[in-house]
């Protein structure tokens, strides 16, 4: 039985569910879950939690992500990416803007911004996914959402051809960010229709492309009984949370028994969640959270016996 986090390279054409389904067949275990959906046409890093690591999948999902995207100015689509039907076209020429104009414009997207999610997305409105409305040719008001763009920058020269302009950007962002919406919004700021023509996720939850394995590589390693060496411990998925190492055996026992504590037994500055780690084994003991009605106390959220 495997336990740990496995960074998978999701190839284009597969859904995130396809990856999980195939892994369950390869590894012969059902206890597998991914940490955030990647659209079928998007390639890149998809961290997958296996065995007891499935208990930390939400925390991996909350950690930052990084993407490289191709932005195409001059044509918009129904899906905001290259898979959709054309909505609008407007010729773009090199006299319209240059590298410096794009660089200045991208600065405006840094920080917390508002996005309207695409109609072809899994965001729910009134209990129904937006893409279900879109497929039925129904219109519905889409709620604005705040997302965090930690960094964004151009990583290629502008390429003007056939009345369009193409360039690549790198984006570091929080969860819930739609890069294709970012591409269309860049076009709006320039005064042109636009779409995202290609997307690769280069980092997710602290895992990068070079650490990621294809399904074929995973199958080979499993057959060679050497896959466990490629798995990251579940503790890796909690590195985004503050932690305290516990030495006292009596306190360790109380933690593993799920007892409540006063903050002042550890740190009065605990604001939200805290991870307790065994000082001897470096293994996580539990995740605690501030008590919802007693701010001076912390209570267990997840205990790892």
Swiss-Prot record:
Locate the active site. Answer: 39 (nucleophile)
| Keyword tRNA processing tagged | yes
Please give the CDD domains that the UniProt record associates with this protein.
PseudoU_synth_EcTruB
Known catalysed reaction(s)?
uridine(55) in tRNA = pseudouridine(55) in tRNA
The enzyme's E.C. designation? 5.4.99.25
Q: Which GO terms describe its biological process?
A: mRNA pseudouridine synthesis; tRNA pseudouridine synthesis
Tell me where on the tree of life, at the top rank, the source sits. Answer: Bacteria
Pfam families assigned to the protein according to its UniProt record, in alphabetical order = TruB_C_2, TruB_N
The UniProt GO MF terms for this protein read: RNA binding; tRNA pseudouridine(55) synthase activity
Give the function comment from the record.
Answer: Responsible for synthesis of pseudouridine from uracil-55 in the psi GC loop of transfer RNAs.
Q: Which family does it belong to?
A: Belongs to the pseudouridine synthase TruB family. Type 1 subfamily.
* Stated name of the protein: tRNA pseudouridine synthase B
* Organism (species): Staphylococcus aureus (strain bovine RF122 / ET3-1)
Q: Which gene encodes it?
A: truB
